[in-house]
């Protein structure tokens, strides 16, 4: 039998933003025994000694005092550096475009932090993610958030039913606009705070400047597949397949896009046209395949839909397992700018089935020059 809310301890991961603030407020109003915990994963003190984490923690303190719940901070900087940031650098070094948020959720928020919460006697860990957990029928399923524009299951694709059985997403049933309203009605300190964007450890800083501190850039030629040099690139790691901005190629005609990379020769391939055939593929291989429920992949393959980047429409695909955690994903129709290193995430209607990491990209049986 389930415990009553007042006998159920929920640790809320609080970032200092409006979403996690409202998540904590709703749980408190529902009668749960709530503790707010701020996670520090990165030392982001800038050259002027300003640290956004300090400001965020102060907002957490204000909100927790308003709601009337205890709070404190935990530090996962070491784990984050080893498990997430090192991977981020290695992927860029390999010419790929990683998604650190997926790994942060898998290794830090819903592993290291979840273990910490359970050690405090918590029954559940709650976060301000826009996603839902369905516990009906004796199964644990992850569903998209009600707000389609904010749904974050893409970044949560590596979570399993075991983890999700201990997780709550209190705002997953709400529209973002309603979350803001609730915060304003309760006069929470974070009610009008703007949403954070971008990668957490880069913050508002320039991406190129940040990356160059860790990886020396190697400029090289930008050329067409026919070998016509169109300019110089600043370093392959700064460009992603399908990128238009920052190429600096002038002239008439359609805009230019990054359509391929040659890591060995340090060449960035470019061509004109948003719908350039070089940007389209029909199959990928994927690694790190993880299914939310153990009963999803019963046979060799399943038909479902997939997203190859956040906020992209769903595409019909067939997923064929080829080894432990490895799969071939065949598209019903060609898809534009599928990028190695990014997440591929599988869906069946509202349900997020799981996902993996895009490895190689193919078209008509030929591997494309995407890394």
Curated annotation (Swiss-Prot):
The gene is mnmA. This is tRNA-specific 2-thiouridylase MnmA. HAMAP family: tRNA_thiouridyl_MnmA. InterPro entries: MnmA-like, MnmA-like_C, MnmA-like_central, MnmA-like_central_sf, Rossmann-like_a/b/a_fold. Residues 150-152, 309-310 are annotated as: Interaction with tRNA. GO terms for molecular function: ATP binding; tRNA binding; tRNA-uridine 2-sulfurtransferase activity. Disulfide bonds join 104-200. It comes from the Bacteria. It comes from Bacillus subtilis (strain 168). It catalyses: S-sulfanyl-L-cysteinyl-[protein] + uridine(34) in tRNA + AH2 + ATP = 2-thiouridine(34) in tRNA + L-cysteinyl-[protein] + A + AMP + diphosphate + H(+).
């Amino acid at each position: 039998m389930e415990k009553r809310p007042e006998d159920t301890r929920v640790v809320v991961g609080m970032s200092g933003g409006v979403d996690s603030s409202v998540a904590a407020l709703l749980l408190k109003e529902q009668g749960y025994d709530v503790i707010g915990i701020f996670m520090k994963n990165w030392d982001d003190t800038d050259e002027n000694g300003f640290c956004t984490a300090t400001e965020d923690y102060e907002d957490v303190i204000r909100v927790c005092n308003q709601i009337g719940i205890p709070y404190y901070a935990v530090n996962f900087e070491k784990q984050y550096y080893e498990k997430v940031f090192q991977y981020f650098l290695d992927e860029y070094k390999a010419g790929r475009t990683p998604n650190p948020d997926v790994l942060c959720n898998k290794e830090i928020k819903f592993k290291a932090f979840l273990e910490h919460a359970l050690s405090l006697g918590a029954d559940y860990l709650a976060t301000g993610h826009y996603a839902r957990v369905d516990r009906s029928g004796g199964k644990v399923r992850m569903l998209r958030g009600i707000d389609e524009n904010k749904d974050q299951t893409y970044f949560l694709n590596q979570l399993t039913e075991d983890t999700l059985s201990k997780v709550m997403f209190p705002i997953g049933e709400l529209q973002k606009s309603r979350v803001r309203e609730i915060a304003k009605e309760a006069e929470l300190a974070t009610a009008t705070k703007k949403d954070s964007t971008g990668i957490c450890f880069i913050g508002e800083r320039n991406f190129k400047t940040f990356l160059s501190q860790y990886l020396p850039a190697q400029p090289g030629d930008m050329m067409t597949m026919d070998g016509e040099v169109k300019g110089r690139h600043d370093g392959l790691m700064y460009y992603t397949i399908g990128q238009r901005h920052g190429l600096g190629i002038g002239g008439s005609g359609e805009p230019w896009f990054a359509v391929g990379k040659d890591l060995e020769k340090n060449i960035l391939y470019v061509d004109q046209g948003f719908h350039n055939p070089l940007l389209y593929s029909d199959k990928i291989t994927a690694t790190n395949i993880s299914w939310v429920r153990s009963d999803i992949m019963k046979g060799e393959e399943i038909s479902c839909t997939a997203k190859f980047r956040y906020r992209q429409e769903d595409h019909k695909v067939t997923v064929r397992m080829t080894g432990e955690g490895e799969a071939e994903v065949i598209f019903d129709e060609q898809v534009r700018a599928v990028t190695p290193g990014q997440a591929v995430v599988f869906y069946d209607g509202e349900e997020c089935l799981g996902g993996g990491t895009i490895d190689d990209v193919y078209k008509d049986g030929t591997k494309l020059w995407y890394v």
